Amino acid sequence: FTTCGVSGRTGPTQNQCNSSYSGTNLTGNVTLVDGIQHWTIPATATYTIKAYGASGGDNGKDPNWSSCPYFCRDGGHGAIIQGDFTLVSGTVLKILVGHHPENVNWLNGGGGGTFVVLSN
């Protein structure tokens, strides 16, 4: 699962994810509700889920900023967690993929969290 090629606080639309997942095993299998991706487990099995948090915003990427190169830094990497889960066919997962924030010249923000939860 991905950001479907978009950023921002509202997340992707159905059309954006349809386009992003075209030609993959997710084609037609992801439904968007308020920017959250819903995926129905196709078969009862043990699934490995690896979730990546978004990286933080880059600082000082404006080449005209007078404090570069002293304070120009790339944002830190997001956390990564992984686990194996036995999931039953028909169970719906809600997936919210964290987004990289805007880059600014000073006091940029952290990246968005990534969440994978059961729908019930």
Spans of model-derived segments:
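A short beta-strand element within beta-rich, extracytoplasmic domains
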Residues: 46-55
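Boundary/junction segments of secreted and surface-exposed precursor proteins
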Residues: 1-19
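Short, surface-exposed beta-strand/strand-loop-strand elements in extracellular ectodomains
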Residues: 58-79
